[in-house]
C-alpha cells in the first residue's frame, strides 16, 4: 500500500522520472548530492517508498523539535549533534554491522549550500562496515 501511494505521488502527481534503479542490497550507504533544499528529504523518501525500500537519513539535531522530531524519527531520521565529541561514525558502523538490513542516506555537503569540500563520514561508515556506496544525484 505504501509503495503504491508513494509511487502515485512521486511519478503521477509530481511527475518525476527515474533514470536508474537502486540495487536491492541488504546494506548500503546512499550518498545524495547536491543537497540544495529541504524538499530533497521528502523527494528522496517518496522515491525510496515508490520502489519499496526503507531508508534512514541523518539530519541536524536542531530539526528534531516538537512536533517535527517524532515525525522525522518515524521517517527514519537520526539526529546529528555536531557539537558532541563522540563519534557518530563509529556508532553507525556498529549499528550497520549488527543489523540484518541497513540503508542510510547521507548528504555529504553537510549543508544546503554548494560545498565542494564534502564531509567524509559516509565514506568512513561504508569502509568501516564494509558497505557499498550508492551515489545519487537529485
Residue map of PLM features:
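Soluble catalytic domains of membrane acyltransferases
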Residues: 3, 7, 11-138
Amino acid at each position: 500500500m505504501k509503495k503504491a501511494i508513494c509511487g502515485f505521488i512521486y511519478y503521477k502527481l509530481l511527475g518525476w522520472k527515474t533514470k536508474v534503479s537502486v540495487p536491492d542490497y541488504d546494506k548500503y550507504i546512499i550518498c545524495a548530492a547536491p543537497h540544495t533544499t529541504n524538499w530533497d528529504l521528502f523527494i528522496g523518501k517518496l522515491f525510496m517508498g515508490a520502489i519499496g525500500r526503507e531508508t534512514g537519513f541523518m539530519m541536524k539535531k536542531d530539526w528534531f523539535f516538537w512536533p517535527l522530531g517524532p515525525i522525522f524519527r518515524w521517517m527514519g531520521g537520526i539526529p546529528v549533534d555536531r557539537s558532541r565529541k563522540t563519534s557518530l561514525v563509529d556508532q553507525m558502523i556498529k549499528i550497520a554491522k549488527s543489523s540484518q538490513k541497513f540503508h542510510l542516506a547521507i548528504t555529504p555537503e553537510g549543508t544546503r549550500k554548494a560545498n565542494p569540500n564534502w564531509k567524509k563520514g559516509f565514506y568512513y561508515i561504508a569502509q568501516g562496515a564494509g558497505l557499498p556506496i550508492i551515489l545519487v544525484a537529485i
